[in-house]
Amino acid sequence: PQVHAMVSINTNNTSNFAAVGFNWKVELGQPGGFYLRPGIGLAYTDGKAGLPPANAPNLTPEERDRRTWLYYNRIDFGSKVLFEPELALGYQVNDKVSVELSYTHLSNGQIFHQGKNQGLDDAGVRLVYAF
C-alpha cells in the first residue's frame, strides 16, 4: 500500500477536512497507463457534529429558526473523526506525475457516533506527484 494525505478547504467556510490513509494502485493493463486506486483512511473535520434539534421544547422562535437553518444548510457529521474511503481512476503521465478522476466519501459509519450519519461526497480531478 501507499500512504496518502490530503486537505480540503471549503470556499463557503463550512466543512473543511484533513485526511490520511492507505491506498493500493491496481494497474489496468500495462504499467504506466491507466489504473484504479482504492483507498481507506481517517479524516478530521471542522464541520458540525451534534447539531441541536430544532423541535426541542421551550425554544424561542429565533432559536428555532436558527436550528432549522442549520438542519437544512449544514451537514451533521455526528463526529469530528470520520472514515474516508476513496476510489480513483488514473493515468500515469510519467514516472512522477499522474492525473486522476477521484471520488471521496466522509462519514462516521455509525462507529464513531451513534444516531445521525450524514456524510459528504466529493468528486474531482487530482494531479498526483510522487516524491
Predicted regions and their residues:
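Outer-membrane beta-barrel transmembrane domain signature
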Residues: N10-F131
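Transmembrane beta-strand segments of Gram-negative outer membrane beta-barrel proteins
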Residues: P1-V7
